[in-house]
Amino acid sequence: MMEGNVQEELELEKSVRRFREKFHGKVALETAVVLMRRFANNHNQVCTYVILYMDNDTDLDVRNHLRNDQVAMNVINKIKRDDQRAKEMPKDKDIQDLAKKMNTLPLTQKNLKMFNDAAENRIPARDRQFACKECDYMWWRRVPQRKEVSRCQRCRKKFDPVPDNKMWGIGEYNCQSCKRMFRGYGQIEVSSPCYMCSKPVSPSCILPPRRNQGPRTRNTHSCFAEYCYNRKEPFVPGLQCAHPKSRILNQLPKVLHPSEWHISTGSTIATCLSQGSLNENDIDDIILDDIKEEEDDEETDDSDS
């Protein structure tokens, strides 16, 4: 019985988080919970109803304003095509009130994109790299684009992602001299010699870890870093080698560039896009861990006040 309650709470937690994230946290927590309980955690269905009610409740002035906005009209026309679903909408007061609240929001480009994504049941997200200097620990998370934050699973501190120009790991290289594409350990803005023509090439991107990375390369890593275990000449003093073997041989930390501590604005909406490493941990276990962490945070805030 206890396991059944935990699973029920878990499913409710996931649906509430996803529903609130679709509207960028503008839905009250209590309202989201009531709607998810009422509609059996079907956040996609409730989201569709809200958008449809918004369309039905739009007054004449707003309609005239929208006609001059092609992006907004595309969203509205796409929703209107589903007439059958509109006819089957439940007469739910909470959904109607929420739709009215959403209709009072200014028609900024940001809000229009939010409605467009919500209509398509999308939560735009990116795979980002995070690194904790104190724990010498690096991980990847899939986080909402509008709020890229992750918590270190070791020290529990929250961090912003590693800057795009400082990311490291398995990089994808495109040599302009011999037109060859290859992969290998590296860091953005740090050159490595092409395996074919030996010309220096910087990685175009750093790839997130995946369970199936494809066949491993037979080429031996090399770069121009001073302490690379297979360095090329002329080496560059102070340049760091990203390869794990070089880090171990020179007793260097695993983290090349740490993340900055996240300064909370109080507007972060916890989501379950992937609150765990991309290549480790079960998603349900991580969500349950996040719930416990949030409860601990609330207890800490109460004790401080």
Swiss-Prot record:
Motif (Nuclear localization signal): 141-157
Keywords: Cytoplasm, Nucleus, RNA-binding
Entry keyword annotation includes Nucleus: yes
Motif (Nuclear export signal): 279-288
GO MF terms held by the record: ribosome binding; RNA binding; sequence-specific mRNA binding
GO biological process, one term: innate immune response
InterPro entries: SHFL (IPR026795)
Cellular location(s): Cytoplasm; Nucleus; Cytoplasm, P-body
GO cellular component: cytoplasm; nucleus; P-body
Family recorded in the similarity comment: Belongs to the SHFL family.
Protein function: Inhibits programmed -1 ribosomal frameshifting (-1PRF) of a variety of mRNAs from viruses and cellular genes. Interacts with the -1PRF signal of target mRNA and translating ribosomes and causes premature translation termination at the frameshifting site. May exhibit antiviral activity.
Protein name: Shiftless antiviral inhibitor of ribosomal frameshifting protein homolog
